[in-house]
Amino acid sequence: MDARNLTAIPHSDAGSLEVIVPDGDAAIRWSSHGYPSSLAKWHYHPQIEIHLIREGSGQLMAGDGLMPFVPGHVAMIGSNLPHNWLSDIIPGERLSHRDVLCHIRPQTMRLLTAAFPETSGFETVLRRSQHALVLFGDSAREAGELLV
């Protein structure tokens, strides 16, 4: 997997807690939204987030890291890591289909690892996502296709 790390910041600058309500007993929640949106703000949540940007460009802020994004950008944001994607738009502009994302409960991933030992390598990915993982190349393309 081709990924780069961003680093975390102390909780004193953590932003607002976003409460994500799963659909029923679902362990995974998929959603999409445009930009600007009330959901696009500096925030954190206990769920792991896999996030695809479909349109526009700008800056991903995750922890104390800052990284440019373009369409096709895919990032994995760890549990309770403050984050936001800021698009470069002109006043009045709207990106109707910018974001596709998936929220996963970390405990679900750990239960999966307990049930299927061959997935134990995913624990390393969970740890690395605490500083955000950004995918590039074929990894980003394949992950993006799975999200949509």
What feature does the model see in each segment?
Residues M1-V74, L81:
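Generic protein-terminus/edge-of-domain signal
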Residues D2-S12, L17-A26, G78-L147:
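A hydrophobic/aromatic-rich effector-binding and dimerization subdomain
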